[in-house]
């Protein structure tokens, strides 16, 4: 029988529910249990694919092409699993499916209501996420805060699950903030008490509290919370601020969180062996070198827009015993005249993805600086496309060369819309999304990065591709197409072989990086940057 764990949040948003859920998932996985995890997002968008990065942060893409919340990146990196489209559910997605069924007459004339139709659809998503992965345990995080009007149908579905599958198969974990008033010198439990009271008013009694705090929590405070919130005192778990996120699973294990969960759900599983994880954390805490990487992006005011990129750089740094000193460079600020001032102290330059015209000329100048000064450079998605545009303009002398996306009237559309995208008008969910194969050119830097594999599978999110009619001119000038689709139609990786490292990929390699298994192309880039710093 599958066990269901539901993680809710109270008092304030952005309290770290996703990290708690991911950390618990890692602990349960290391007990030998098969774990999956999902995120419920109460917003009305179908998915975050068309949302501004300033609103939502990065869009995380799964193997099967779902555009999802960035928390799924935390889940995959912590638990080291590949999630699917059932792992992110929004209000918009649920209502869209229910209304589509109503239009088809599938409800046989019934009045369609929040209860039972919306709540039934939500419960079906929970069960489908578990069944499609054959999991022993599924962890479901509900976004937002208890008390938000948008969350009510989600919480009602969670309440009903207890009756549907039995109380011994369900556990409710509530994460809250325990504020510390410096002037008074004391922690305040009242916000947590009120949050739990509101949750109980919706029919959910939490079995565990995870309290986010900046200061150590005395046992007396835990006992008080246990008494007023009706949970066992040992089930009041402290989640203190840490230097590195990957410390959190170890901190939670030290408080027997996973054992309490297993006892409640009657899961007979051995103790979690966290030896490898602990060694990784110890290494992360004691890195001996530092390498400066300049990230040239459009959305640098909100680092969450590049969360997976940053994590992938860190992972590759760990593998090289190196801390990454990230220099955020706004692409709008980069010009041919100041590129050296902005980028001259960087050991490597990364140009990540994005959409739209703004900042693209700055990215092109950053790429030009890297090429002309032989600074290791990694381009991702739009960064790959602009790498091709930069080469066309400044090496092949194609004045005005551009991407058709950015300038439809350009004489040299180096990047063009994919053939199967021409007649598509909707923006959401219509990109080339998910896992696709990439055939590597033997002897190339890309092939060497991937240990001379013939084919790698990587995740994509794009609508435009390199225009193949320009391939002969590029190749004649030494531009290497080192990764292509198996049918040779789509360009996946480009590089300049004579440079220290000048490689750009159409796909998003960062989405498959893990703290104990860094993505190979990122590792090759970071390794080249380290050599460049010596």
Swiss-Prot record:
Sequence positions that bind UTP: 13, 188-193, 224
Regulation: Allosterically activated by GTP, when glutamine is the substrate; GTP has no effect on the reaction when ammonia is the substrate. The allosteric effector GTP functions by stabilizing the protein conformation that binds the tetrahedral intermediate(s) formed during glutamine hydrolysis. Inhibited by the product CTP, via allosteric rather than competitive inhibition.
Start and end residues of each Glutamine amidotransferase type-1 domain: 292-534
CDD domains tied to this protein: CTPS_N, GATase1_CTP_Synthase
GO molecular function, one term: CTP synthase activity
Residues that hold CTP according to the record: 13, 148-150, 188-193, 224
Residue numbers binding Mg(2+): 71, 141
UniProt entry tagged with the keyword Transferase: no
Binding-site positions, L-glutamine: 54, 354, 382-385, 405, 463
Assigned keywords, A-Z: ATP-binding, Glutamine amidotransferase, Ligase, Magnesium, Metal-binding, Nucleotide-binding, Pyrimidine biosynthesis
Catalytic activity: UTP + L-glutamine + ATP + H2O = CTP + L-glutamate + ADP + phosphate + 2 H(+); L-glutamine + H2O = L-glutamate + NH4(+); UTP + NH4(+) + ATP = CTP + ADP + phosphate + 2 H(+)
Pfam family, one: CTP_synth_N
Source species, domain of life: Bacteria
PANTHER family in the cross-refs: CTP SYNTHASE, CTP SYNTHASE-RELATED
Family of this protein: Belongs to the CTP synthase family.
Function (record text): Catalyzes the ATP-dependent amination of UTP to CTP with either L-glutamine or ammonia as the source of nitrogen. Regulates intracellular CTP levels through interactions with the four ribonucleotide triphosphates.
Listed name of the protein: CTP synthase
